[in-house]
Amino acid sequence: MKKLFYNILTMAIIATATVSFSSCEDEQIAYTLEGTWKGNMYISSYYDGRSYDATYTEITFLKDPYAYSSGNGYWVDYYSDAPWDYVANHIDWKVDFGTIYIYFVEEGTSLRISDYHLNNDRFYGWIDDGGNNVEFELYHTSTPYRDYRWGYDEWVDDWYYYSRSRGNGASDTTKVEKPIRYVRGK
């Protein structure tokens, strides 16, 4: 009986340690992920019967100060041969047992990143939208508040947008069809 008690107690301690170690790892992943990343996510948008490939993508992950491994941010795909310059979305993201889940607020769609390598400078691996599993590569361009000099130097974000003018006589009240984003194969 005593041996059975110790075996059950040992199993409970191991299970607790496993859960607590993975939550610390999730927090570290979220901390490293925070900031702006730029590169190729192999994203395309379908619009008006045509498919357009994004030239590059910028993703800003902002960590929630009250949650250890989640936050929100922005995902912007830039295009050079499309009727628009970029497609931007607000995102909600979380890290759960090492897997990064990204939810596009305006589109109501999700992506999952589970097989990846992440350090302070580079983020690469595989992204899955539920139907396609595609390789991606991003480089870290900025991080808010790290190495901040508290009054001696400002953190400046080079985040800005501009778009082509409509030029076709359409007014700002014209309802425009949104492009549909999807992950494309290489």
Model-inferred region functions:
Residues K38-S45, S70-Y78, D128-G130:
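Generic short beta-strand segments
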Residues Y47-R50, D81-D85, E107-S114, G130-L138:
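Short, surface-exposed beta-strand/loop "edge" segments at domain boundaries and coil↔beta transitions
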Residues R50-I100:
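N-terminal glycine/threonine-rich, aromatic-flanked beta-hairpin/loop signature
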Residues M1-T10:
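Bacterial N-terminal signal peptides that target proteins for export
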Residues W75, F104-E106, D115, I127:
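Residue-level recognition of conserved beta-strand positions in structured domain cores
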Residues D96-G98, Y116-F123:
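Ser/Thr- and Asn-enriched, surface-exposed coil loops between beta-strands
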Residues Y86-F97, D128-K186:
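Edge beta-strand at a domain terminus
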Residues K2-K3, A17-S44, D158, P179:
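Bacterial Sec-dependent N-terminal signal peptides
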